A protein has these predicted regions:
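Cytosolic regulatory regions of ion transport systems
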Residues: 1-267
Length: 267
């Protein structure tokens, strides 16, 4: 199937997998996968692909309202907002969404409001601590999927260890956006994964060594892996015999120590 494991977080250690790596229970796995095979990949990990019908959002600001507006036609949504005036304002803007005025870190309140019956919980208040604590409350109440907005970069490494399924960071997105403009000419995009010693770099192939041989023969460093190749608007998960063409966009997952070796292949 068109899928590839590109990074593993094992006991706070980052691994770039090779063909002989084995996954063990508790690994946090990052993979590139064709959208049509996501369910199959999830099944391989031993997880269930949960259908989300009921979601609770903590925080009625712009982000919370945006999420609710975009998903209200697909699922039942509740918004929890601590500010009384804000709650009334949201109720007028989103008449078909149930608005609850209260403290999202109050376990008793959240249980009364049915958090334990939700398929997903999204915490997007303006306070990182509130988002983290409320997510822990959701995990305590056995909510299957949790997402938190966390802007303090120092908090990001601990988020996988406390059970968060996903973290969104506006500050990290801004840092990554800035990095795109200070990289070399052959780099189209740059990003990092919170809590992991790995960088994601999208290269534009020129006439370097990367284009002269199948990728299995170009001498790619052990701590780096090609996750995807975009050729003429067609995205593929490459194999060992894939031949990269000039102009292709190549997404590489690499440990920082291997970046220079990777860049030499594209020059």
């Amino acid at each position: 199937p068109p899928m590839r494991v590109v990074a593993i977080n094992r006991n706070q250690r980052t691994l770039i997998p090779r063909g002989d790596h084995e996954l063990i229970p508790g690994d946090h796995v990052f993979a590139v996968c064709d959208p049509g095979y996501i369910s199959q990949f999830i099944e391989l990990t031993g997880k269930q692909d949960i259908e989300i019908n009921d979601m609770m959002i903590l925080g009625g600001g712009l982000v919370g309202q945006f999420v609710a507006k975009n998903l209200s036609g697909e699922m039942n949504i509740k918004i929890v907002e601590s500010n009384v005036g804000k709650s009334e304002e949201i109720a007028n803007v989103l008449p078909n969404t149930l608005i609850i005025q209260g403290d999202g870190t109050d376990i008793d309140l959240m249980a009364v409001e049915g958090l334990q019956d939700m398929d997903a919980f999204v915490a997007v208040t303006g306070d990182d601590e509130t988002n983290i604590i409320s997510t822990l409350v959701a995990r305590h109440l056995k909510v299957p999927r949790t997402i938190a907005l966390v802007n303090t970069l120092e908090y990001l490494p601990i988020t996988p260890t406390i059970g968060m399924d996903a973290v969104v960071s506006k500050q990290l997105l801004t840092v990554n956006a800035v990095n795109r403009f200070i990289q070399h000419q052959q780099i189209a995009a740059y990003a990092t994964i919170p809590g992991m010693d790995v960088q994601i770099i999208e290269y534009i192939a020129g006439k370097g060594k990367i284009c002269r041989k199948p990728i299995k023969d170009v001498g790619f460093p052990d701590d780096a892996i090609i996750g995807a190749v975009m050729h003429e608007d067609q995205m593929t998960v490459p194999k060992g015999d894939t031949l990269i063409q000039p102009g292709d966009r190549v997404v590489v997952f690499t440990r920082p120590g291997s970046i220079q070796a990777v860049e030499r292949l594209f020059k």
